[in-house]
């Protein structure tokens, strides 16, 4: 009995192709401690510190293992995670799960978040940039891996929708339609910080000058029973070779980011993501051996 039996028995992906399915795995500092591997924890790898304005909920914070499944078909991604969890039911307990989405379009445009602004304009794109920003160059088990900073961000859409366009653009420091920074014409034009409001999101993030790779997705979970408003927002995911890059950015955003009027950080985690698997090897081999 092989995986084909599972495929046929569950049936949810019969007739579907892989739709560019990819899986990313990571572990937290608590994972290393629970398995007696704390001596192998890199010095830069520790839980994220508290940040101003966040209202973290225990159910969305921490955890020992993270699995990110991405595919062009949500059912394919869910099927992959479902079967991984099924294999470990006697060993693990699920903490939380969120289904995210991003506008595909023609794949040439930067996707927009639920506020209608382009999200990920300043991402690294070249192999050289990835080596400089994303992949660790450490000599230990994290060689070739990356650190994932994960934040669950609730977006207050009703408040945002009552805000005029100029105020929305001032919040970001970019024009909504084109994505261009203030004072410029095109989305990817170099940002002139002097043209941006001092409390704008882009200016505060750019002041730190610590590039990261954003792989964020929007989410929608129906209605918040307490507020009667949409339970929706952003699954913010950033990869970097040094977690301090994200920490410095988020610290600078701090309490002065105008965006905080429209969002609340409710979940958080930091995970060390393994490098790819060599032929004949297994995930995390360098850590466990």
Where are these regions (language model features)?
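Long, histidine/aromatic-enriched segments associated with O2/redox biology
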Residues: 1, 5-289
């Amino acid at each position: 009995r092989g995986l084909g039996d599972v495929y046929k028995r569950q049936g949810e992906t019969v007739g579907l192709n892989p739709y560019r399915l990819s899986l990313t795995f990571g572990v937290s500092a608590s994972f290393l401690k629970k398995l007696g591997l704390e001596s192998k924890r890199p010095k830069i790898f520790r839980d994220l510190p508290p940040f101003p304005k966040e209202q973290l909920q225990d159910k969305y914070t921490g955890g020992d293992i993270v699995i990110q499944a991405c595919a062009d078909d949500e059912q394919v991604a869910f099927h992959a995670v479902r079967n991984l969890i099924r294999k470990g039911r006697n060993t693990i307990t699920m903490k939380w799960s969120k289904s995210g989405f991003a506008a595909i379009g023609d794949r040439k445009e930067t996707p927009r978040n639920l506020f209608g602004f382009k999200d990920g304009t300043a991402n690294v794109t070249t192999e050289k940039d990835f080596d400089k920003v994303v992949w660790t160059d450490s000599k230990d088990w994290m060689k070739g891996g990356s650190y994932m900073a994960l934040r669950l961000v609730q977006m207050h859409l009703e408040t945002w929708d009552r805000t005029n366009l100029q105020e929305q653009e001032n919040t970001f420091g970019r024009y909504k339609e084109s994505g261009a920074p203030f004072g410029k014409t095109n989305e990817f034009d170099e940002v002139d910080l002097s043209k941006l409001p001092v409390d704008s999101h882009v200016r505060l993030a750019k002041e730190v000058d610590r590039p990261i790779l954003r792989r964020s997705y929007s989410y929608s979970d129906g209605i918040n029973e307490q507020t009667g408003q949409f339970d929706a927002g952003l699954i913010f995911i950033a990869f970097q070779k040094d977690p301090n890059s994200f920490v410095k950015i988020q610290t600078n955003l701090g309490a002065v980011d105008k965006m905080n009027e429209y969002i609340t950080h409710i979940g958080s985690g930091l995970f060390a993501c393994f490098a790819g698997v060599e032929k004949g090897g297994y995930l995390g081999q360098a850590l466990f051996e």
